Regions:
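Conserved N-terminal structural module of periplasmic/extracytoplasmic solute-binding proteins
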Residues: 2-102, 114-118, 162, 292, ...
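Short helix-initiation/N-cap motifs at beta->coil->alpha
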Residues: 65-75, 95, 165-172, 242-256
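Short helices/loops that flank or line small-molecule/ion binding pockets
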Residues: 73-84, 103, 154-155, 172-179, ...
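A structural signal for short loop-to-beta-strand junctions that line the ligand-binding cleft
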Residues: 78, 86-88, 118-154, 183-184, ...
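Hinge/lid segment of periplasmic solute-binding proteins
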Residues: 94-146, 171, 197-199, 284-286, ...
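Extracytoplasmic/periplasmic solute-binding protein
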Residues: 132-141, 146, 168-216, 222-223, ...
Length: 441
């Protein structure tokens, strides 16, 4: 597949939304300093950049927020198509990296770093996510190992003394919790959760080898395990399929215990603190249940820092320094972790102070024992170690997720089985892939 075709894939996958790209020219500052442009939707990158500039006064870093993740990818695509306006460095979710690799937008960092030595710096799940077809296209900046967040008060009231360790236990606990009037969890149609659960249940539904693409959702063992469980639980009214994720109603239900637990990435901790402060002290965290008790996990979210391929040679050293600072330097990592990001480095995950934390940080900077004094990072750290690296995202993952509910909606509304809905989604993905020039295996 040539670069023109690959660029077209990104265009079709993101859409035609145009976003003005101000201040993104490849210039050297008039002061003689090297000037880097960085795109990030996460404010903690800006904080890290300010610390970086103090230590590197010869480099100016201009961080721009061009919008949401989707808007960032649209802007990247528009700039790549136009041939100008790309940032030098960009934050990018792991799920979107394959798409921009195949549009020839990102630099292979194995050509500018000794990535063989960096491999053990990062967790298995994040390192796997930045490795595409033998190249390394971003440095892991944060991660989202899946964990189980549960309302201990509701569990106690239902007679569930410990969080489930297997999915069979999860199902049995769900019946006890439903008897109290609450649901054990909710899902009204979340493509991110679907993929993360496939990953955590040992699945590997997608495989790309150059232009040859395998999409095998309906026969994938991880997908089958998840769909069988969710089908049974939906049929028995054991999961809330009506409350939309991230809405005020969802937060209210988490706060009052109507939804007793959720499956999410470790980054969810601070979102709970901000979204349901009334539940302070009630929630705990546990490792995600598994099929048979054997440790295995997946990632739900996370992002890396990538250098764009057309960066001027005179800026490359500065970009390398900045990316390395944010992703591997203790000070750079702390600037993000202290503001809610979950680390991707094994060193941070094993630090005594990190593991001993029992508080989250309120917006005013004060400490909050949201998890009732639990050393929650001990759980998250182990969750990160349990992630299997055997996972690949589609080379048009943002598009795939954008049509998930169009195809899966009938399952959540009770009109179709999960497998029937998944089969429709799979067929739509294969048709789209063929339209973009991939050879379906």
């Amino acid at each position: 597949m040539n670069n023109t075709t690959r660029a077209a894939i990104a265009t079709a996958a993101i859409g035609a939304l145009l976003i003005p790209l101000a201040g993104c020219g490849n210039t050297i500052a008039s002061s003689g300093k090297t000037e880097l442009t960085v795109w990030s939707w996460d404010a903690s990158i800006d904080r890290a950049a300010k610390n970086f500039m103090k230590a590197n006064p010869d480099i100016t870093v201009k961080v721009s927020n061009v919008g949401s993740t989707e808007e960032t990818y649209t802007a990247l695509n528009n700039a790549a198509q136009a041939g100008n306006g790309l940032p030098d460095v960009t934050l990018i979710e792991y799920l979107a990296i394959p798409q921009f690799v195949h549009s020839d937008t990102l630099m292979d960092l194995s050509k500018v770093y000794d990535t063989a030595k960096l491999k053990d710096t990062f967790t298995p799940g994040t390192w796997s996510s930045v490795n595409i077809n033998g190249g390394v296209y971003a440095m892991p900046a944060d991660s989202g190992p899946m964990a189980y967040f549960y309302n201990k008060d509701v569990f106690d009231q239902a007679g569930v003394s410990e969080p489930p360790t297997t999915w069979d236990e999860f199902y049995e606990d769900a019946k006890k919790i439903r008897a109290t009037g609450s649901y054990i969890t909710s899902d009204s149609g979340d493509a991110g959760l679907f993929n993360a659960m496939m990953w955590a249940m040992g699945g590997h539904a997608y495989k790309l080898n150059d232009d040859k693409l395998t999409i095998n959702i309906t026969k994938d063992k991880g997908a089958q395990r998840f769909m069988n469980l969710w089908q049974k639980m939906r049929d028995e009214d054991l999961i809330d399929v009506h409350t939309k994720t991230w809405t005020d109603d969802w937060m209210k239900s988490l706060g009052d215990g109507s939804i007793a637990s959720l499956i999410s990435g470790a980054w969810m901790a601070n979102n709970l603190l901000q979204g349901v402060p009334q539940a302070t002290g009630k929630f705990r965290v546990a490792l995600l249940p598994t099929v048979d008790g054997t440790p295995i996990n997946g990632e739900y979210g996370g992002s890396g820092l990538a250098i764009t391929k057309k960066i001027p040679d005179g800026k490359l050293d500065a970009a390398k320094k900045f990316v390395e600072y944010v992703t591997t330097n203790d000070e750079g990592i702390d600037a993000r972790v202290s503001n809610g990001s979950f680390p991707a480095t094994t060193k941070t995950l094993n630090q005594k102070d990190f593991l001993a934390k029992t508080t989250l940080r309120n917006a005013d900077g004060s400490d909050n024992e949201f998890f009732g004094g639990q050393k929650y990072n001990e759980v998250f750290s182990q969750a990160a170690k349990d992630v299997t690296g055997k996972w690949e995202f589609l080379p048009f993952e943002p598009y795939a997720r954008s049509i998930y509910n169009d195809n899966m909606g009938p399952f959540f509304s009770g009109k179709e089985t999960f497998k029937a809905a998944a089969d429709k989604w799979q067929k739509a993905l294969k048709l789209y892939a063929e339209d973009q020039g991939f050879i379906i295996q």
